[in-house]
């Protein structure tokens, strides 16, 4: 559980990080996101995230995340990590629809919602694909954010439809592109 919280905390510390103009190695909804954030890049922990050119890492509508992490306590098991993320989402956001886990032959995909209330509140849909590699547990994340103020019945239906498409899209990404992007140079 500490590993999951660590991964989420790392993603939230974007404000203290740096960004460069390097395009995402994979597309989300047919688009390459050109602004890159490079987080920790060690032998066992690596993070790169991407947003649109006109957005910031504090305020974005689409995000692509690439990660490599070591999870020896679960033997770098992708399905177990997806189950752990789903359990964490259920605990933190019990009033949201339940997470959706889809096992795959080489890993697992999990989709869940998160939100932040308040003046700048938002709803966020996250889709993670996990697989085991020689260096540890890899993940690819597609996330979308919408202001809570814009959420009505139609927007909620649109979000649900987009999630189905993102789950299918992330399952078809060539994972070698992610692994190559996370290689230490």
Where in the sequence are the language-model features?
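Secretory pathway targeting signatures of secreted, lumenal, and periplasmic proteins
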Residues: 31-73
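N-terminal signal peptide c-region/cleavage motif recognized by signal peptidases
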Residues: 16-17
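Mid-chain, structured segments of secreted extracytoplasmic proteins
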Residues: 62-104
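Short secondary-structure junctions
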Residues: 27-43, 91-103
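Short, well-structured beta-strand
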Residues: 112-184
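Cleaved targeting-peptide boundary
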Residues: 20-27
């Amino acid at each position: 559980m500490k590993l999951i919280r660590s991964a989420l905390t790392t993603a939230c510390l974007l404000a203290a990080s740096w960004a460069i103009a390097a395009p995402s190695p994979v597309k989300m909804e047919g688009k390459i996101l050109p602004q890159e954030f490079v987080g920790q890049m060690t032998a066992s922990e690596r993070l790169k995230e991407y947003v649109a050119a006109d957005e910031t890492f504090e305020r974005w509508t689409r995000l692509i995340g690439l990660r490599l992490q070591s999870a020896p306590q679960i033997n770098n098991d992708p399905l177990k990590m997806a189950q752990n993320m789903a359990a964490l989402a259920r605990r933190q956001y019990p009033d949201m629809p339940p997470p959706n886990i889809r096992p795959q032959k080489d890993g697992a995909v999990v989709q869940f919602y998160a939100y932040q209330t308040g003046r700048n509140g938002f709803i966020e849909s996250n889709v993670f694909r996990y697989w085991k590699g020689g260096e540890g547990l890899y993940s690819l994340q597609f996330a979308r954010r919408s202001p809570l103020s814009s959420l009505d019945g139609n927007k909620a239906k649109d979000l649900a439809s987009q999630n189905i498409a993102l789950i299918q899209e992330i399952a078809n990404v060539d994972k070698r592109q992610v692994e190559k992007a996370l290689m230490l140079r």
